[in-house]
From Swiss-Prot:
Pfam families found in the cross-reference section: EFP, EFP_N, Elong-fact-P_C
Function, in words: Involved in peptide bond synthesis. Alleviates ribosome stalling that occurs when 3 or more consecutive Pro residues or the sequence PPG is present in a protein, possibly by augmenting the peptidyl transferase activity of the ribosome. Modification of Lys-34 is required for alleviation.
Post-translational modification remark: Is beta-lysylated on the epsilon-amino group of Lys-34 by the combined action of EpmA and EpmB, and then hydroxylated on the C5 position of the same residue by EpmC. Lysylation is critical for the stimulatory effect of EF-P on peptide-bond formation. The lysylation moiety would extend toward the peptidyltransferase center and stabilize the terminal 3-CCA end of the tRNA. The hydroxylation of the C5 position on Lys-34 would allow additional potential stabilizing hydrogen-bond interactions with the P-tRNA.
GO CC terms, sorted: cytoplasm; cytosol
Protein name: Elongation factor P
Pathway(s) of this molecule: Protein biosynthesis; polypeptide chain elongation
Record-linked InterPro entries: Elong-fact-P_C (IPR015365), NA-bd_OB-fold (IPR012340), Rib_uL2_dom2 (IPR014722), Transl_elong_fac_P/YeiP (IPR020599), Transl_elong_KOW-like (IPR013185), Transl_elong_P/YeiP_cen (IPR001059), Transl_elong_P/YeiP_CS (IPR013852), Transl_elongation_fac_P (IPR011768)
UniProt cross-references to SUPFAM superfamilies, sorted A to Z: Nucleic acid-binding proteins, Translation proteins SH3-like domain
Residues carrying N6-(3,6-diaminohexanoyl)-5-hydroxylysine: K34
Length: 188
């Protein structure tokens, strides 16, 4: 794998630190008036998704991580594992609850997901940026009820709970941003 010096760190770069893969989220190279230059780097730990901030000297280096992002189709959940298929080779991969995390509530059958593999094993699953889900439960919107400026909670077909505007009713399909978990619009 390639070696990267701290001044080469860019957003999206995947590196190895302490034997684990990390993704660089942002990097700021600082040259103080006195002393050695350094890089202030925000990293995301790929195994757990936690964010860390580290400082690297300009002479520090890190190995590139042997991490692969693949576009796979979500097939089904058997209760313990979530199964995905490569559309080109028809090879199937299984991801456990640790790799899926909170993204399980956004997975729909036949959805294209980005699965990150490390040493051939899935370590994270990223659902599509937007999904269209049906509302299965929400409070009825009363005519003239505009006292609150917010919205109301709605339970979606996958079990996710999203705050929606007062005019949205049970049975309607809505578009949700999976990155923030927020309502975007109604689907006609």
């Amino acid at each position: 794998m390639a070696t990267y010096y701290s001044n080469d760190f860019r957003s999206g770069l995947k590196i190895m630190l302490d034997g684990e893969p990390y993704a660089v989220e942002s990097s700021e190279f600082v040259k103080p008036g006195k002393g050695q230059a350094f890089a202030r780097v925000k990293l995301r730990r790929l195994l757990t998704g936690t964010r860390v901030e580290k400082t690297f000297k300009s002479t520090d280096s890190a190995e590139g991580a042997d991490v692969v992002d693949m576009n796979l189709t979500y097939l089904y959940n058997d209760g313990e594992f979530w199964h995905f298929m490569n559309n080109e080779t028809f090879e199937q991969l299984s991801a456990d609850a640790k790799a899926i995390g909170d993204n399980a509530k956004w997975l729909l059958d036949q959805a294209e997901c980005i699965v990150t593999l490390w040493n051939g094993q899935p370590i994270s699953v990223t659902p599509p940026n937007f999904v269209e889900l049906e509302i299965v439960d929400t409070d009825p919107g009363l005519k003239g009820d505009t006292a609150g400026t917010g919205g109301k909670p709605a339970t979606l077909s996958t079990g996710a709970v999203v705050k929606v505007p007062l005019f949205v009713q049970i049975g309607e399909v809505i578009k949700v941003d999976t990155r923030s978990g927020e309502y975007v619009s109604r689907v006609k």
